[in-house]
């Protein structure tokens, strides 16, 4: 067996297990590059639209972005956006958009849609403005927008994007992008909702580290009555691939 990657299926989940974080970053970057190249080629041969790619925040994708920065990717054919964001100034140290820009997109040449933060603008208003930007930028059909690729992560509590356990955002069905309060005293979050994630052509979830192992095991082999938010990504039509390192997969009882 190739020790860099183990490819298995667990129920509806397509799972790719990499030996360590470096192998995960390399493998994820290769998959993302291949996907973007194919979709940009198809788009240019069809209507010339930009390929819509949601970028993940958090710490796990940083190494993947470093790999992507060295690869031959037709970024001029891409419109990137943030799958979720803290509602903070665009240069704030906690901003996902700032991290994504520094790590990759500031020098890549892609169109990059950032959340329209303003000190006097409520988070709900910013979410509505950003949703309008996304709708104008991506393809779709009569049922709604169709993002091409969504990159996401997963927290130790099983959240993905800014869809947290117990959050009202889990039940939103009439918005593609929404504002949600995670905890009192913390910045509001803006996030893609399940209706938008379920419309994607593909979703890649990157998970790294032993601290994520219990949540990943519960997501992929649930034992409780209430599925963790990350599992609900698989309730739609979008194919979801779980790209994980062996430490995160420790609870899956792999051979």
Task: Give the positions of each predicted feature.
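N-terminal glycine-/serine-/threonine-rich phosphate-binding loop
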Residues: 1-53
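ATP/nucleoside-binding phosphotransfer catalytic cores, i.e., glycine-rich phosphate-binding loops
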Residues: 2, 201-255
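Ligand-binding beta-strand-loop-alpha-helix segment within the catalytic cores
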Residues: 2-12, 76-151
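Glycine-rich beta-strand-to-loop/alpha-helix junction loops that act as flexible
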Residues: 55-60, 152-156, 208
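Short, conserved loop/helix-junction motifs that constitute active-site signature segments
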Residues: 71-79, 106, 169-170, 195-200, ...
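A short secondary-structure junction signal
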Residues: 125, 160-166, 215-219, 254
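Class I SAM-dependent methyltransferase SAM-binding "motif I" and its flanking Rossmann-like core
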Residues: 150-195
């Amino acid at each position: 067996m190739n020790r860099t990657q183990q490819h298995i299926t667990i129920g509806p989940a397509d799972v790719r297990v990499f030996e360590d974080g470096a192998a995960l970053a390399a493998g994820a970057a290769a998959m993302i590059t291949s996907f973007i190249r194919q979709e940009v080629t198809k788009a240019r041969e069809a209507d010339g639209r930009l390929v819509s790619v949601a970028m993940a925040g958090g710490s796990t994708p940083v190494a993947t972005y470093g790999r992507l920065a060295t690869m031959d990717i037709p970024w001029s054919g891409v419109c990137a956006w943030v799958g979720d964001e803290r509602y903070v100034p665009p240069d704030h140290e906690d901003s996902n958009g700032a991290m994504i820009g520094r790590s990759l997109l500031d020098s890549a040449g892609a169109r990059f849609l950032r959340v329209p933060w303003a000190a006097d603008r409520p988070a709900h208003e910013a979410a509505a403005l950003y949703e309008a930007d996304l709708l104008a930028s991506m393809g779709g059909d009569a049922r709604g927008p169709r993002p091409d690729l969504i990159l996401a992560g997963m927290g130790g509590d099983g959240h993905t994007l800014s869809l947290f356990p117990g959050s009202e955002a889990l039940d939103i069905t009439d918005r593609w992008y929404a504002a949600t309060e995670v905890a009192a005293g913390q910045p509001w979050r803006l996030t893609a909702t399940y209706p938008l994630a379920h419309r994607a052509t593909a979703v890649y979830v990157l998970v790294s580290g032993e601290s994520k192992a219990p949540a990943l095991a519960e997501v992929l082999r649930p034992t409780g009555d209430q599925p963790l938010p990350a599992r609900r990504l698989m309730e739609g039509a979008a194919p979801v691939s779980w790209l994980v390192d062996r430490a995160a997969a420790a609870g899956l009882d792999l051979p």
